[in-house]
Amino acid sequence: MDLQTKLESIIPTYRERVKILVKERGDVKVDEVTIAQVYGGMRGIKSLVTDISFVDPDEGIRFRGHTIPETLAMLPKPPDSEVPYVGGLYYLFLVGEVPLESDALEVEQEWQARSHVPDYVFNVLRSMPVGSHPMMLFSQAILALQHESLFARRYQEGMTKDEYWIPMLDDSLNLTAKLPTIAAFIYSLKYKDGTYKEPNPELDWGANFAYMMGVDT
């Protein structure tokens, strides 16, 4: 998988950057926190390190430094579509580079291969009380999928910290591949007839979600 190869080439650089930052600047204060901020939902507090996103107070969220309009404009799109491949956005998040169409399509193909949702997940959702909130059902389905986690399996078998990212990448791809099917089924369970609609292998991630939701694509 080219995505894994790409990450394998850049992860050591990120690790070295963090190592140097902690060693040389570990005692630098990054913020001061007031009681009002604590009671105000932690708003404005610098408490996380991330390269993926940042919320600009004037322009809104930025993904890898790009505004939403910039992101939508620069990502590869399916033919005759104004909306990019979701696989391209995923690639941008992980790698930090604008993907080629081939990069986006590789992610889309990985998702198609990993999209099967085990029957027990649907059974868990069907067994939940009527009136359960859709987000609770969504969370419950994701928790049920822990049984499928490659990271959990590898962790029990034993692996070094330098290897963590490999099964984490697999788990990330496996989970994101299944989310459209799970979300569409929850929508059907809550607001329609509760039937399950199989994904269409000819459609990309975003189009498949719309298809399973009953939206005309």
Describe the predicted segments one by one.
Residues 1-217:
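Hydrophobic alpha-helical bundle cores within soluble ligand-binding/oligomerization subdomains
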